[in-house]
Amino acid sequence: MSRTSQPMRPRSTPGSGRKTQGRSASAAPTRKIVIAALAGLAVLTAVVVFALRGQGSSDDHTTGDAGNQGFGHVHGIAIDPGSSALHVATHVGLFRIDDPRTAVRVSKDDLDLMGFTVVGPQHFLASGHSAHGPANVGLIESTDGGATWQEKSLSGAADFHGLQVAHGSVYGYNSTDGAFMVSADQRSWEQRSRTAIGAFAVSPIDGGTVLAVGRDGLQRSTDGGRSWQSVPDTPAVGLLAWDRTGVWAVARDGAVWSSTDGGGQWQRRGAVPGEPDSFAVQDDTLFAALSGDRVVASTDGGATWTDRYAPE
């Protein structure tokens, strides 16, 4: 999850259990709204591209372009379980990392990806922005490894700065209104709470347990995000990931921490070799995207790191 998905101040305090679909999330707390799924799924078009650090315009990044690519800030990093390919979601679209010198832009759709998660082989979910409307794309889906994208839900209404698939559901943090939301079918959503959080991670064992980075430190929910409590005596972390071995976190200074009791006790394991943007863990390997278009990996719990992508 991305470092810059900073906690925001909610506009109001809702009740829990609200469901919403489509363009609005403002119904009464106890009211459930289920709107028919969007018809005629369409491939999303190009997005306004933010300026890259030391790079050219978006025209430099066409589908299949490979080599010394600069992709700027990374908002998500994940492995495709089918191909074992490493993917990074950025302000200028989705890139596949083939080797330490080769990054391939996967899609012609210049999507500004703010949230990104992997469902299965070549099956991705994302959120972000599009220049040709809607400005907030809601939840979008790709079933061809990111080559094309289709609308799923909340088009025009949601900008998920955090997404995670766990326990058969999608968990998301909507930056437009501070809503923590969950969907079992990727179309209708239950708003669990409104709270100021950034990165979050769902327990792989218990779908009701969620850790999140709040304004005043780490927050824990034991009811699936409906309520949150502060976790005392924790390091000042900015990025989170959770796998079968425990919780992993990266602090703002790059320090890597781990916890085997759900965030109660923490052990410092090492540090990433740069300023962290995004962080993930899969199959006992830690991945970190760093400022400067660099991606690194660790197989010893963060003690040492090797380059997965480091353009010259």
Label every model-predicted segment.
Residues 92-106, 138-153, 181-192, 219-230, ...:
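Asp-box/BNR beta-propeller loop motif
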